[in-house]
Design a protein with these regions (language model features):
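Bacterial extracytoplasmic/cell-wall-associated proteins, especially those involved in peptidoglycan
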Residues: 4-110
Length: 110
């Protein structure tokens, strides 16, 4: 379980560490939503990058909660993407946006 927590914390940090605690929570919330539907962390994590980041204490606390006592997703969005992805892929603005992070309830591609 500890290894899984560290892995998830690395991903949270890598995906949104530059956006601070709010951004990290939003990415973790997409993981919570995906876990609600799959109940399998391998299925959840295959959609994320950022595995090589050193996790912060906050990312680790989010990961610990996701593994030991997952919350019901607040945003109900399985997709998270950046402004850069939005521009290069010509995707729409997300249902929820924070700084350069977009959360979307449906696949943003065509």
């Amino acid at each position: 379980m500890k290894q899984l927590i560290v892995l998830i914390a690395c991903v949270i940090q890598g995906e949104a560490g530059g956006l601070g605690e709010i951004g990290m929570f939003m990415v973790a919330d997409t993981m919570a939503y995906r876990y609600e539907t799959s109940q399998n962390w391998d299925d959840v994590l295959k959609y994320y990058y950022g595995y090589n980041s050193e996790p912060s204490d906050f990312a680790t606390s989010l990961a610990t909660r996701l593994v030991t006592d997952p919350w019901k997703s607040f945003f109900q969005c399985p997709f998270a993407y950046s402004d850069q992805d939005r521009y290069t892929q010509k995707w729409p603005v997300g249902n929820y946006t924070y700084k350069s992070l977009h959360l979307k309830q449906s696949w943003p591609g065509k």
